[in-house]
Amino acid sequence: MRQERVILLNEQGQPCGTLEKYAAHTATTPLHSAFSCWIFNEQGQLLVTRRSLHKKAWPGVWTNSVCGHPQLGETTEAAINRRACFELGADIDSLSPVYTDFRYCATDPSGIVENEVCPVYAAHIVSELQLNPDEVMDSQWSNLEDVLSGIDATPWAFSPWMVMQVSDVKARELLRKFANGN
C-alpha cells in the first residue's frame, strides 16, 4: 500500500493541505479528515475489533469495525471500502451515513492526539473476514445492545471515538435501526 496521507482541515472543515499519516499523529495532531464505520453481518451483529499492538495510537483497544482517512480525491465511501478490504480483508455494501458531522479530539495514554472530522457510517459485510494482523489483533461479532451496554458500563475499555459516537442519541438509534434491517 502506498504511503497514506491525511487531509488537513481548517476550523471550517475545509481542506488546507496534506501530511503523511504517521507524521500527523503526534501530541499536537492537526485537525484532519477521517471516517469511522460500524459493520454488521446478516444476523444484525456488530463487528467489534481490537486494534493491533503495532498501532501508534490506542494499541490493543477495542473499537468499532474500521476507521481510517480518505485520501486526496477519494470519496469517503471509497475510503471505507479500501480500509475494510485492507484491515479486515472484507467486502462491504449498503453503506449508510449515521453521524455525518462527528468531530472529536482525544489523547491516548502515550500522549498521541486524534483530532478529526470523522463522519460515521454503517455497512453490511458480504464476505468472510481475513484480518490484517498489522491493523487488527482480534475481532468479535456481538449483539449491538450488548456492545452499547458495555460502552455505557465501561467506557474506558473502548476507543474514545467509539464511545463518543454512541453518546449521540440519533447516531445510537440509527445504528439500532441498521442492525435490525430498517
Swiss-Prot record:
Cofactor(s) listed: Mg(2+); Mn(2+)
Nudix hydrolase domain ranges (all copies): 30-164
Function: Catalyzes the 1,3-allylic rearrangement of the homoallylic substrate isopentenyl (IPP) to its highly electrophilic allylic isomer, dimethylallyl diphosphate (DMAPP).
Subcellular location: Cytoplasm
Binding site for Mn(2+): H25, H32, H69, E114, E116
One example of a Gene Ontology biological process annotation: dimethylallyl diphosphate biosynthetic process
GO CC annotations, alphabetized: cytoplasm
The protein, known as: Isopentenyl-diphosphate Delta-isomerase
Family of the protein in this entry: Belongs to the IPP isomerase type 1 family.
